[in-house]
């Protein structure tokens, strides 16, 4: 069994930056969730908010990595209108029975991240070994490193226990 897989969706790049940081620091595989249509511009923003509010699970491309092959799956999503992104909702719906241990993170421009992390855990049907919510402004200023170190230490600690 492989140690860890980081799976994320990112529309603006914030969640991608965090996911790649975690994967690099933890020596984990990293896989973006790919969807069938783009979310660019105002219409992409509007569509994202509408799907999040409706809690839609949309069509996504098949994953190349099987979460069942990993001891830990780290899931990352942006906060959209106070909810997890619809691509992440679709990924969890498709793979939640394949998860062993999970860790969760979210990025946000505003608020709602803690609620999103609880919703993700409930939707996965298990308690995460670690969670963290990062503000886009923290990421822009490079202030997210300390929170990520604590996040990764928490899931590494749970692995040793």
What are these regions (language model features)?
Residues 67, 93-100, 123-126:
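Short, conserved loop/helix-junction motifs that constitute active-site signature segments
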Residues 75-76, 104:
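Redox-cofactor binding/interface segments in oxidoreductases and associated redox assembly factors
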Residues 85-89, 99, 117:
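Generic internal hydrophobic packing segments that stabilize the cores of diverse globular domains
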Residues 78-81, 109:
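Short glycine-rich anion-binding loops that position phosphate/pyrophosphate groups of nucleotides
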